Amino acid sequence: MQTSTNYPRLGIMGGTFDPIHHGHLVAASEVADLFSLDRVLFVPTGQPWQKKNRTVTPAEDRYLMTTIATASNPRFSVSRVDIDRGGPTYTVDTLHDLHERYPHAELFFITGADAVARMATWRDCTEMMSLATFVAVTRPGYSLEKTELGPLGDSVTMVEVPAMAISSTNIRARARANRPIWYLVPDGVVQYIAKEKLYLPSGQVGASSMW
């Protein structure tokens, strides 16, 4: 694997990003500031193993939306490491690959507190926790005590970000219902969703109120 530019403190924002929204971007910015990160790398999942019960937008669309959303921030970039690996995406594999690519970086894995609550079920959880500092971003109204994580609790730092009240699930539902999604996602992502007719029920042609 080709070695990339060295960043001493590298944030890893993993997620399905279906679609990416302002909550993700604000969370990444807040964590970057709090932990003095040199760069935040957004890593769209290839095939999210924990979402087999629903249809996920194709990886290339999610990658392009993430690229559009992060383009204006010089501290942000996007990695295809999970998409190009193929097969189900497991965080332990993501972190191993990124350690190869950034051998001198200290990694900070940023994810939602709701995902962290299920972390004990993730593949090779103990090994995974040794590969990065885990930062759990919470949203208002969502409570997660470290004691709920058992022995993993001491390895996770909680950060509350108000903008995380926005959810990709709600955005998909609004798009399907022909309701506006402006200001929930970056402008370029609104335009991409409309152009590619993402999230619309089968056979529906347009979503004019999205504009």
From Swiss-Prot:
It is an enzyme of class 2 (transferase). Pfam families: CTP_transf_like. It catalyses: nicotinate beta-D-ribonucleotide + ATP + H(+) = deamido-NAD(+) + diphosphate. GO terms for molecular function: ATP binding; nicotinate-nucleotide adenylyltransferase activity. Catalyzes the reversible adenylation of nicotinate mononucleotide (NaMN) to nicotinic acid adenine dinucleotide (NaAD). Keywords: ATP-binding, NAD, Nucleotide-binding, Nucleotidyltransferase, Pyridine nucleotide biosynthesis, Transferase. Pathway: Cofactor biosynthesis; NAD(+) biosynthesis; deamido-NAD(+) from nicotinate D-ribonucleotide: step 1/1. SUPFAM superfamilies: Nucleotidylyl transferase. It comes from Corynebacterium kroppenstedtii (strain DSM 44385 / JCM 11950 / CIP 105744 / CCUG 35717). Belongs to the NadD family. This is Probable nicotinate-nucleotide adenylyltransferase. One of its GO terms (biological process) is NAD biosynthetic process. Its EC number is 2.7.7.18.
